[in-house]
Regions:
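Structural core segment of the AMP-binding/adenylate-forming
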Residues: 2-32, 105-106, 133-231, 546-548
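Conserved AMP-binding/adenylate-forming core of the ANL superfamily
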Residues: 57-59, 68, 76-121, 125-129, ...
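Conserved adenylate-forming
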Residues: 103-112, 236-247, 252-295, 315-317, ...
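Short beta-strand->loop structural element characteristic of the AMP-binding/adenylate-forming
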Residues: 115-117, 124, 128, 132-165, ...
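AMP-binding/adenylate-forming catalytic core of the ANL superfamily
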Residues: 145, 152, 166-167, 342, ...
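Adenylate-forming
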Residues: 164-175, 197-199, 297, 325-326, ...
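Conserved AMP-binding/adenylation subdomain of ANL enzymes
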Residues: 273-292, 300-341, 355
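Conserved AMP-binding/adenylate-forming
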Residues: 291, 317, 367-368, 375-394, ...
Length: 604
């Protein structure tokens, strides 16, 4: 957690990125020019890639500072592209400045919580940095959430102002959260509505309005609680804005954490700028001012917010915005603006494969990073073979801003492993029954991390904060893993997902990996179901490839040759689609509830 000493440190331009390591930290052999050696405390040093210094610490900074330096360095370079309409860095900077004044006119002060409920679009980017420059705190909302979910998060986060697109049902749901006469319990005080068609090129904007009238909501006119985004840009200057420090809160990012109940992770400017610099340091082969990044993952998800938005702008990349993934829009973007960088989640790379995307369409892509969920070995191998680009698996969690581990771009890109700790990140495997006790390499336990990117805690949740943030500063991730003697970490499963079967620990990921080796399996997820004899047994839900003639009997026979008897699923069900989160990750929540309802007491 950021302390007063850290907040008092000088803040040079983010282009410098890292400070020299303090005396009590061992320098990494790659960037520091040392000879790789084995370190009992930091075994990953022996494997660290050349040119990357683990011992260097990110210099605390603020996100508006980062943007200001990016605008100064890359002013006339293309910054954003939205279906053919472009913004330069200078244009983005100017609109952020004007919108920040508008938010201040609306009453945003230092610490005011402002919700962003939008897919990827220019309004999100402008609002994100404008709220931060005005001193506010960004609270990301999933625009696909139902009214009850939006209301619960708005109340839990003390969100008072919400920015939303004028598309239905998004707009109606957010307007329904306003506190009005007869609805005094509404959590919101003000809504800022953005005209989606206004972000499109002129002809496309007209076409959208004509073709999609049913999708365009009605923004109330002359309503003192509703402001058009365009009006924000017309606000006259109010003078100097608030002083923002690295230790100030920047984002409340909601997560299920390790318990499944949504909680707001408190992320400071120092946390988020540290993580974007850690990512930039790891991907130091990226060419500043020359890259083009395809942003198909939603910015309201912390992985995309850090890797695609924050790091993308710090790199001086052109960011091509897609509001959602569909194969037609994706292929159009590949042809029109060939990307060099593609962050994604496993299901995105799987979808690209399943759609038969031609290798030539991916020829411009140099690096892909997969996060958000474990990357199946088959997906990694097949995607690299089909695309010709490097796909590295990383790992992170919302509570760490989020990226903590990644496989090297140069050196061993170890399949099945989340890689090595990023610069400044310390990692230990702790005993499952005693999170204060570190284990030796090769032993299985809970992965714990410590570093400048780790959150300050959960908003309004002191007990939950104390449960996951240990007294020595390490964060409990809730993931079971093994650290090899050379520092590479392999995750076995989530602690909450381990299936206790006849007294044995059964790991769903091992069963899922076996299922993915079947040529007719498109997606698979495994979880525990009540069993009157064993306590729990594995249950597998499988989505076949389109056109495949797959049967449950086929899969039972297939797994019988690959899994031990106790690992073999008692139940296998085929589904046309499996539940997914907003970023395309497979979700076990709905299936777990379904199994509880079908087998309330462990019956057959």
């Amino acid at each position: 957690m950021a302390g007063d000493a850290e907040r008092a440190r000088p803040v040079p331009p983010p282009s410098s990125g890292f400070s020299t390591p303090p005396p009590d930290r061992a320098p990494a052999p790659g960037g520091a020019g040392g000879v790789p050696h084995q370190d009992a405390v930091h075994p990953w040093l022996a494997s660290y890639p050349p040119g990357v210094d683990w011992g260097a610490l990110p210099v605390p900074a603020t996100l508006p500072e980062m943007l200001r330096h990016a605008v100064a360095r890359f002013g006339e370079r293309p910054c954003l592209d939205f279906f053919g309409r472009g913004w330069t860095y200078a244009q983005l900077g100017a609109q952020v400045d004007r919108a920040a004044e508008g938010f201040r006119r609306l009453g945003v002060r230092k610490g005011t919580h402002v919700g962003l409920c939008m897919p990827n679009c220019p309004f999100y980017v402008i609002s994100y940095f404008a709220v931060l420059k005005a001193g506010g705190v960004v609270v990301n909302f999933n625009p696909l959430h139902m009214p009850m979910e939006l209301s619960a998060q708005a109340r839990a986060s003390d969100t008072r102002i919400m920015v939303v697109l004028d598309l239905e049902p998004m707009l109606e749901r957010v307007l329904g959260l306003l506190r009005r006469p007869g609805r005094e319990d509404g959590p919101l005080r003000h809504v800022v509505a953005c005209r989606f068609a206004g972000a499109l090129p002129a002809l496309k904007g007209i076409g959208f309005r004509l073709a999609r009238r049913a999708s365009i909501g009605t923004v109330p006119r002359h309503d003192p609680q509703v402001t058009l985004f365009d009006t924000l840009l017309e606000a006259p200057p109010l003078g100097d804005g608030p002083a923002i420090t690295p230790g100030d809160v920047a984002v409340l990012q909601f997560t299920g954490g390790t318990t499944g109940r949504p909680k707001g992770a408190v992320l400071t400017h120092a946390n988020l700028t540290a993580n974007l610099e850690q990512v930039r340091c790891w991907f130091h082969e990226c060419r500043e001012g020359e890259e083009r990044l395809l942003a198909v993952l939603p910015f309201f998800h912390v992985f995309a917010m850090t890797v695609a938005l924050n790091a993308g702008l710090a790199w001086g990349a052109e960011i091509v915005l897609l509001p959602r993934y569909d194969q037609a829009s994706f292929r159009t973007a590949l042809r029109r603006k060939p990307p060099t960088l593609l962050p994604g989640v496993p299901t995105l790379f799987k979808a690209i494969l399943d759609a038969g995307t031609p290798r030539a369409m991916l020829s411009s892509v140099r690096f892909c990073i997969s996060g958000g969920a474990p990357l199946p070995l088959e997906v990694k191998h097949d995607f690299e073979a089909a695309s010709g680009c490097v796909l590295v698996e990383g790992y992170g969690l919302t509570e760490a801003s989020p990226v903590c581990f990644c496989n090297p771009l140069v050196g061993e890109n170890r399949a099945g492993s989340i890689g090595l700790p990023l610069p400044g990140v310390e990692a230990e495997i702790r005993a499952l029954d005693d999170p204060g006790r570190a284990l030796l390499p090769g032993e299985r336990g809970e992965l714990c991390v410590r570093g400048p990117n780790v959150m300050q805690g959960y908003w309004g949740e002191p007990e939950e904060t104390a449960r996951v943030l240990l007294p020595d500063g390490f964060l409990r991730t809730g993931d079971v893993g093994i650290m090899a003697p050379d520092g590479y970490v392999t995750l076995v499963d989530r602690i909450k997902d381990i299936i206790l079967c006849s007294g044995f620990n059964v790991y769903p990921r091992a069963i899922e990996e076996a299922l993915y080796t079947h040529p007719d399996v498109a997606a698979a997820t495994v979880l525990g179901m009540p069993d009157p004899y064993r306590g729990e047994s594995p249950a597998a839900f499988v989505q076949p490839r389109p056109g495949a003639s797959l049967t449950m009997e086929d899969l039972h026979a297939f797994l019988a040759e690959r899994l031990s008897p106790i690992e073999r699923p008692r139940l296998i069900e085929l589904r046309e689609e499996l539940p997914r989160t907003a970023v395309g990750k497979l979700s076990k929540t709905e299936l777990r509830q379904e199994l509880r309802e079908r087998h309330p007491r462990g019956g057959a």
